[in-house]
Amino acid sequence: MLPRAAWSLVLRKGGGGRRGMHSSEGTTRGGGKMSPYTNCYAQRYYPMPEEPFCTELNAEEQALKEKEKGSWTQLTHAEKVALYRLQFNETFAEMNRRSNEWKTVMGCVFFFIGFAALVIWWQRVYVFPPKPITLTDERKAQQLQRMLDMKVNPVQGLASRWDYEKKQWKK
């Protein structure tokens, strides 16, 4: 296990010992500029990512960040929302919102069940041989009568439940 982990560290992209984009140091691979929207993924159980959602700010957003350093009572509700959106991608309500992925999953499940049913039907019609004649109801009745005539298992079995004098099942 340890050699495998060591090789994965050496052979991964970015070289050995060099931290990637998701490191806590904030360095990027290749030394280029970071994108304006980072790869932060805020979840309900870890809502505070290490990096802000938006890293490159325009003049209006920079002025808003400077205004943030002052008293928060001077900020309007819209400015507070804009500051929140600069720092975080989603609100808790948006994080907790149910997705419609279950519809896709159920659609795929029903599609494959339907496809399997079509394959089974096709096999019964075109692949499997016809049923043997011994499986018809008439032949089954004849087999039962033959077993009763031979008195198969007369102590506890089938013949013990048949009344041979009245020719009917015992009650």
UniProtKB/Swiss-Prot annotation:
Which CDD domains has this protein been placed in?
A: Cyt_c_Oxidase_IV
Give the residue range annotated as the organelle targeting sequence. 1-28
Topology in the membrane? Answer: Single-pass membrane protein
- Mitochondrial matrix domain ranges by topology: 29-100
Transmembrane stretches in the record are 101-126
Tissue and organ distribution: Highly expressed in lung.
Give one Pfam family: COX4
Keyword Amino-acid biosynthesis found: no
**Which InterPro entries would you find in this protein's record?**
Cyt_c_oxidase_su4, Cyt_c_oxidase_su4_fam, Cyt_c_oxidase_su4_sf
- Renumbered to this chain, region (Disordered) spans 13-32
Entry's Gene Ontology BP terms: cellular respiration; generation of precursor metabolites and energy; mitochondrial electron transport, cytochrome c to oxygen
Annotated disorder: Exocrine pancreatic insufficiency dyserythropoietic anemia and calvarial hyperostosis: Patients present with pancreatic insufficiency, intestinal malabsorption, failure to thrive, and anemia soon after birth.
User: To which protein family does this belong?
Assistant: Belongs to the cytochrome c oxidase IV family.
- Name of the protein this chain belongs to: Cytochrome c oxidase subunit 4 isoform 2, mitochondrial
Source organism of the structure: Homo sapiens (Human)
* Organism phylogeny: Eukaryota, Metazoa, Chordata, Craniata, Vertebrata
